[in-house]
Amino acid sequence: MEMEEVIAEVLQKIVPTEEERAFVKELIGELEGIAREKAQELGLEVKPYFVGSLAKDTYLAGDHDVDLFLAFPLDTPLEEVRERGLELGKEIGKTLGEYEIAYAEHPYVRAKYRDVKVDLVPCYDVRDWKDVRTAVDRSILHTKWVNENLNGKNNEVRLLKRFLKGIKAYGSEIYVRGFSGYLSEILVIKYGSFVEVLEKADFILRQKVVDPAGWLKREPEIAMKTVRREVEEDKPLVVIDPVDPRRNVAANLSWEKYGRFYFKADEFLQRPSLEFFFPTGKTGGDYLAELRRKGTHLITLLFDVPEMVDDLLFPQLERSARGFEKALSREGFEVLGWNTGRYGAEKAFVMLELDRVERPRVKIHPGPEFFTERGRDFYRKNERVWLVGKRLYAEKRVKENIIDVVRELLEKNQVALGKNLRETVKGAEILVDYVPRPLENEAYLFLSREKEGLKH
Amino acid sequence: MEMEEVIAEVLQKIVPTEEERAFVKELIGELEGIAREKAQELGLEVKPYFVGSLAKDTYLAGDHDVDLFLAFPLDTPLEEVRERGLELGKEIGKTLGEYEIAYAEHPYVRAKYRDVKVDLVPCYDVRDWKDVRTAVDRSILHTKWVNENLNGKNNEVRLLKRFLKGIKAYGSEIYVRGFSGYLSEILVIKYGSFVEVLEKADFILRQKVVDPAGWLKREPEIAMKTVRREVEEDKPLVVIDPVDPRRNVAANLSWEKYGRFYFKADEFLQRPSLEFFFPTGKTGGDYLAELRRKGTHLITLLFDVPEMVDDLLFPQLERSARGFEKALSREGFEVLGWNTGRYGAEKAFVMLELDRVERPRVKIHPGPEFFTERGRDFYRKNERVWLVGKRLYAEKRVKENIIDVVRELLEKNQVALGKNLRETVKGAEILVDYVPRPLENEAYLFLSREKEGLKH
């Protein structure tokens, strides 16, 4: 398939129809009206701003969640923005129908209206970066900057976003660490088009610093400080935020996600195909066959999770998996990989691929130097004891079976776990070389590396 | 048993009888006569010296090998000492009966006379340390110093030597690294008696430096240089040689052997027993039962060895065992311990205790950073490939069985082996959890840690 054909076909699927556009326009009109009305009723001098991909007209067809920011004058005390902003959000939410409170740096209202998710976020009405006081304040500036600079390349952004989603490199959530929508927009603005961004995958990485708004000239000291800080933290890219020289737009982009983009961009340019944008779901396979093929073992911990949003839960699951990896490797089990996720509404899982599930019944236990008080103690207390250099060693009986080892590690608090999971993981069900049916495909994707593999 | 009783009983066994003394005296007389005669015949101005425990009267009953040194005048060229010394040795050897050439720093003759081993070693007739030119030259000075300072404490030395033999801490050979006879003599001279040396096991270690001849006052610069050098090399003791301030008599003493002495001295003083001097041979046990108890595995390599003295062979066997330890641990097998030795007249063995003999069929293979030429290569060449940070990883198929792994490591020269063993080890027979009958007890002593264990 030719590049043009592929792109044309993708565009057909991702550019919103006139019908959808009309719906969105109407929606925005209604929401703005309601917001103004409610602000007035509460006697608040608040301006409603639409931000995000909807406001920038870079949303993908069918994906039109609304971000409505409620901007307070700069001289409003922060406490008032928090409280009265939430109050206003609730009032609007009530009018729209169902709503709930969500928590980020500050609480905000998440409502649903005409089947569309509407976030109502209090913020300051900032004019430039010097006014920024809360994390969300920049959004208004981002929207403004993109709209002023995109120059009709909205569909190029849509292509890039869809491509990044297809190759699993999209999303700036802390547990994804991929490309954000804003970063995609900046790259298109800077390099001209979807294809040009892809062609520059290697170049961009080598350049390292992207400065579309020329901050390095306008505010060299501040911008250089940003560059130095981010380079020191070994970030793959430093994209100086066009609206704030103190910020790296790509601060949360991981090397892994840039790597996916790096290889997939090249492959797509070599052999364009729809598959990159819309990967056909894996048919899956037999995880037990995969275990046999590799000669490895799978242990799965299933446990209840407290009510938590993914943003909070997923990093804690990962932290716990890493904790097991470290603790088990100290115990002589090699962890070849791990995988975590939700299991149903109230449970989560940690999967660990291990080199074995049994170990010797004895372990060599290094002791102190022999000529110390502790050395003489160690000598007295151990039956089989010997020296290597000046250090004493002894044979120590240990649990041999992986389940016993894991239970003991948990009992002795020797696994670093996510802080809200400490208690619940202790009561985990531990499965060896077996997962319940709903996790079979997950286990297969994990063990076969299709999940994180670059070639799938 | 009281200390006095034990000591009395030991002395009875280790002090030579009048009969033995008479035999030794006669032997020495004869040997001296023959040596003088042969030197004269060859027109050599050589003085015969008896050195070692026989000459110092510190030999253990029944253990009366002769060290006869053939001392050349200091103005003899080294080459002449080597050649004519060997010639003289051969002449004496012929007169005595059978003999062979042995190799140390210089070749010497090892003869047998009246069922006693007689070493005939060419050296210089040195007056003090400034004259020392070859490693053996000091022996004459050692003998002289001990005889001048021992003050009739010969049996105290015998007790200490027998004790050190009993606890397996005696012998200065490079593959033993224990206490030498000369070191035992110095300790008795310095601390007064066998029991006093034992009582000071901790004190001596803490003092670190023993200077019986007062070199630190007489030659402070040279002696301090010796102390600094040996302390830097982390030797357990620095015993400045009474006849040479440049030398640490305990240079070859290992921490392990001092550790044995340290604990056994204390135990003996607490509960004196003959067992320390004459350990009753272990009855041995079942090595297979030991493997089952520990849940570990034993692999044994049997291979031919070239004709080599123990001094050369044993360090090479140890080096090879360490080589396997390192190579196998890189391959994911934990080596809990190793053991080496001769097997019959022409073979040697390396035993390795392992945590397992099978591993997964796949290994995680770390590759280069993704954005390099090598990274793109790695990506192309591997099927299952993923990123951790900026580094690529791939799944690699590996041999799973220990025999295949060892064979492959040897084929690819990935095991550091003793230099004369490289070829022969490649043809080794590899046994898993089985040893031939003559090695069964050796395997048991190794696996049960009775061999190196401090408590046996």
UniProtKB/Swiss-Prot annotation, chains A, B:
Which cofactor(s) does the record list? Mg(2+)
**Which residues bind CTP per the record?**
53, 56, 142, 161, 170
Return the broad EC class: transferase
Report the catalytic activity.
a tRNA precursor + 2 CTP + ATP = a tRNA with a 3' CCA end + 3 diphosphate; a tRNA with a 3' CCA end + 2 CTP + ATP = a tRNA with a 3' CCACCA end + 3 diphosphate
Q: Which GO terms describe its biological process?
A: RNA repair; tRNA 3'-terminal CCA addition
InterPro entries, per database record: CAA_C, CCA-adding_arc, CCA_tRNA_nucleotrans_2, NT_2-5OAS_ClassI-CCAase, NT_sf, NuclTrfase_I-like_C, Polymerase_NTP_transf_dom, tRNA_NucTransf2
tRNA processing among keywords: yes
Give binding positions for Mg(2+).
Answer: 65, 67, 119
Q: Which UniProt keywords apply?
A: ATP-binding, Magnesium, Metal-binding, Nucleotide-binding, Nucleotidyltransferase, RNA repair, RNA-binding, Transferase, tRNA processing
Q: Which Pfam families match?
A: CAA_C, NTP_transf_2, tRNA_NucTransf2
Q: Does the keyword Metal-binding apply?
A: yes
GO MF, one annotated term:
ATP binding
EC numbers on record: 2.7.7.72
Q: Which residues bind ATP?
A: 53, 56, 142, 161, 170
Functional summary from the UniProt entry: Catalyzes the addition and repair of the essential 3'-terminal CCA sequence in tRNAs without using a nucleic acid template. Adds these three nucleotides in the order of C, C, and A to the tRNA nucleotide-73, using CTP and ATP as substrates and producing inorganic pyrophosphate. tRNA 3'-terminal CCA addition is required both for tRNA processing and repair. Also involved in tRNA surveillance by mediating tandem CCA addition to generate a CCACCA at the 3' terminus of unstable tRNAs. While stable tRNAs receive only 3'-terminal CCA, unstable tRNAs are marked with CCACCA and rapidly degraded.
Family statement = Belongs to the tRNA nucleotidyltransferase/poly(A) polymerase family. Archaeal CCA-adding enzyme subfamily.
How does the record describe its quaternary structure?
Answer: Homodimer.
What more the UniProt record tells us is: A single active site specifically recognizes both ATP and CTP and is responsible for their addition.
**What protein name does the entry list?**
CCA-adding enzyme
The species this protein belongs to is: Thermococcus kodakarensis (strain ATCC BAA-918 / JCM 12380 / KOD1) (Pyrococcus kodakaraensis (strain KOD1))
